[in-house]
Amino acid sequence: CACLFLNEYHNDPLDYFADDSPIIQATDLSEAAFGVHHPISVQLDSKTRDGIYAEGFIRSVKAFENWLEAHPQVAHHNSYLTVLTQLKRHVHQGSLKWNATPTSASEVADLWNLYEMSSPDNSPQSLGLDKHFQSAVISLGIPRMSSSELIALEQNINTWFQQNAPHINASVTGHAVLFASIGKQLTSNMFIG
């Protein structure tokens, strides 16, 4: 019975594919080039229409992105603010002077309009926004990690929002997180009942 506590569950959804399958080949390339094994999405709901333009929401997203930058388990992240910041810099011939994240509602709205006009394919959804500009998605790329580490990362993200931006509803999604949670529950049910 003491060995029960030494059991460690791990349920990587990519382990179900053959080594020569296209998804494994693509994942291997992603790991080699970017250190990314799994994609995770963090959906942020401002709870109000056009809420992604609100300065409080913008500050919270930027603060969360700063937290992600410092987090050792996050290899990459991208959001609508990242894209709009890059657009702002490119409009000014790549000058790093213009590399600051937009901070005001009017600046974000102006950059959004510029983004939307630059291509017929540019839509709110292409930036991870909903059509009412109420919610935004931050895409994360994470390296290979155990199911326990994935669940801990999800909990850390939720805790960050509870402590630093309780006005935002945050939810963490992705196939790796789903498999980790299901695997933990199934393993617990097998051993504990």
For the regions a protein language model found, what residue spans apply to each?
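Extracytoplasmic
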Residues: 1-193
